[in-house]
Swiss-Prot record:
GO terms for cellular component: plasma membrane. GO terms for molecular function: CDP-2,3-bis-(O-geranylgeranyl)-sn-glycerol synthase activity. InterPro entries: CarS (IPR032690), CarS_archaea (IPR002726). Catalyzes the formation of CDP-2,3-bis-(O-geranylgeranyl)-sn-glycerol (CDP-archaeol) from 2,3-bis-(O-geranylgeranyl)-sn-glycerol 1-phosphate (DGGGP) and CTP. This reaction is the third ether-bond-formation step in the biosynthesis of archaeal membrane lipids. GO terms for biological process: glycerophospholipid biosynthetic process. The keyword Nuclease does not apply. Its cofactor is Mg(2+). It is found in: Cell membrane. It comes from Saccharolobus islandicus (strain Y.N.15.51 / Yellowstone #2). Pfam families: CarS-like. It catalyses: 2,3-bis-O-(geranylgeranyl)-sn-glycerol 1-phosphate + CTP + H(+) = CDP-2,3-bis-O-(geranylgeranyl)-sn-glycerol + diphosphate. It is a multi-pass membrane protein. The chain crosses the membrane at residues 7-27, 55-75, 78-98, 116-136, 138-158. This is CDP-archaeol synthase.
Amino acid sequence: MSIAYDLLLSILIYLPAFIANGSGPFIKRGTPIDFGKNFVDGRRLFGDGKTFEGLIVALTFGTTVGVIISKFFTAEWTLISFLESLFAMIGDMIGAFIKRRLGIPRGGRVLGLDQLDFVLGASLILVLMRVNITWYQFLFICGLAFFLHQGTNYVAYLLKIKNVPW
């Protein structure tokens, strides 16, 4: 297979995670996953930006993409996409947890962490489920996520979906 084919395939493999991660900002209010609780350091666990409603939307959109992908691959992709979406959101929540520990408020910027937390979460479950991802596919997805995150967040800011352009 060609490198171009492998890179396009990696986009298809990671598409549920990208869709799940990108769907969260459309939910403006909801029940915080941390129920407003603080960690031992006195700061919120995740913050108001991580809600059950946002998680449900992310899982729904990511899994729906997986159902479509399963028509081209195998039926297993419905389950894989659900778990990939879930782990992408877990990665995103871990990123929020780290930011809160560093004293960075909701909407605060941490270059690298903001763009790659969901990719790392999705990659973990893909590896555990034995989905064949090469290192260059992984690095390509990390680069793509980094630049797409910058662009899509700026557009979301212009459309008043997000409060900050990052």
